UniProtKB/Swiss-Prot annotation:
The keyword Zinc-finger does not apply. GO terms for biological process: translation. Pfam families: Ribosomal_L21p (PF00829). HAMAP family: Ribosomal_bL21 (MF_01363). This is Large ribosomal subunit protein bL21. Part of the 50S ribosomal subunit. Contacts protein L20. It comes from Paraburkholderia phymatum (strain DSM 17167 / CIP 108236 / LMG 21445 / STM815) (Burkholderia phymatum). The gene is rplU. Belongs to the bacterial ribosomal protein bL21 family.
Length: 103
């Protein structure tokens, strides 16, 4: 069984037992959270789409860790003008383990 969930403005296809990194969710480590924005639920050949959400469906997950992604380097340069600018960005994430899919 799998589900398509929406969190942090992105969509993820998840199955029970998977781990995934999503945009930061303010929760403690080992806390159980419920993701209610389920867009689709499928098992084998059958799939159920929501309009836009599947009514009564939810995904239970456990917070495994909180962290930061690797740095994305930004470099701006203007040729012949001796203008160079360095920058970087590290995005926060929450790692989840999917425990159950309720449809």
């Amino acid at each position: 069984m799998y589900a398509v969930i929406k969190t942090g403005g992105k969509q993820y296809k998840v199955a029970v037992g998977e781990k995934l990194k999503v945009e930061q969710i303010p929760a403690d480590i080992d806390a159980e959270i419920t993701l209610d924005q389920v867009l689709a639920v499928g098992e084998g050949e059958s799939i159920k789409f929501g309009t836009p959400l599947v009514s009564g469906a939810s995904v239970k997950a456990t917070v495994v860790s909180q962290g930061r992604h690797k740095k994305v380097t930004i470099f701006k340069m203007r040729r012949r003008k001796h203008y160079q600018k360095h920058g970087g960005h590290r995005q926060n994430y929450t790692e989840l383990r999917i425990d159950a899919i309720n449809a």
